[in-house]
Amino acid sequence: MTGSLNRHSLLNGVKKMRIILCDTNEVVTNLWQESIPHAYIQNDKYLCIHHGHLQSLMDSMRKGDAIHHGHSYAIVSPGNSYGYLGGGFDKALYNYFGGKPFETWFRNQLGGRYHTVGSATVVDLQRCLEEKTIECRDGIRYIIHVPTVVAPSAPIFNPQNPLKTGFEPVFNAMWNALMHSPKDIDGLIIPGLCTGYAGVPPIISCKSMAFALRLYMAGDHISKELKNVLIMYYLQYPFEPFFPESCKIECQKLGIDIEMLKSFNVEKDAIELLIPRRILTLDL
């Protein structure tokens, strides 16, 4: 699927692509079910939650499962800063795409260098000439490398500071994956973020993933400027000069309570205070 997008390929003004959330941890997949509006979960054209291994997901895609139809996908690698594929979901990528030869090729595509946590690099698998990778690619066109740890030497999560070590890194990784998704894909496969070696509790990870996904799916029902404001308050960087009057007027039109927005506490408050569910169903 290539070429320019027309209005029929847009959802709320953003490119329609199926989001496939995939994880082996049932706690994670159940939390996704709870935190993402049912209107999206029930409409598998836009979102699917897969409880199981990457291999089982790929098997269903290879069989032409109607839920996973599509010709070109990207998959998120939420690993380390050096591109090693030694654990967690990255280990599944390692095994699926060809083991050590694939890891060597993948790291070469990343320049063999350090990539900062919070960065994102798109790797085109069509450039890989490894026989096993070519054989198993099955529509996976890209890997989006989104480091969540420098190295898996110790958990990043500190229960004394859940915002900076949990909510924020997960949101940044999810937002980066969505913002860097190539334009010529039908779908994006994303595992649970930071719930493995990074040690972020699933309830925190899933909340930030759901918030990023809601912002993305809201499309042009929420202006870019207001999205910036919502992110600023979700991550608890309250700075009034970055909250323009136009966004306050927009909040009133969308039914977002400005005072509740300004006092939003990510540890206690529901994300519906920032993005009312009705906004997400306007074009479904």
Swiss-Prot record:
Any one Gene Ontology molecular-function term assigned to this protein's record: hydrolase activity
Catalytic residues in the record: N80, D90, H145
SMART domains xref list: A1pp (SM00506)
Keywords (A to Z) from UniProt: Disulfide bond, Hydrolase
EC top class named in words: hydrolase
EC number, UniProt record: 3.1.3.84
One of the protein's GO biological processes: tRNA splicing, via endonucleolytic cleavage and ligation
Gene3D superfamilies referenced in this protein's UniProt entry, alphabetically: Leucine Aminopeptidase, subunit E, domain 1
Keyword flag Hydrolase: yes
Residues that coordinate or bind substrate: D23, Q55, N80, D90, T148, T195
InterPro entries xref list: Macro-like_dom, Macro_dom, Macro_dom-like
S-S bridge residues: C128-C136
Catalytic activities: ADP-alpha-D-ribose 1''-phosphate + H2O = ADP-D-ribose + phosphate
Role according to the record: Highly specific phosphatase involved in the metabolism of ADP-ribose 1''-phosphate (Appr1p) which is produced as a consequence of tRNA splicing. + phosphate.
Quaternary structure, from the entry: Homodimer.
Name this polypeptide is given: Probable ADP-ribose 1''-phosphate phosphatase YML087W
Native species: Saccharomyces cerevisiae (strain ATCC 204508 / S288c)
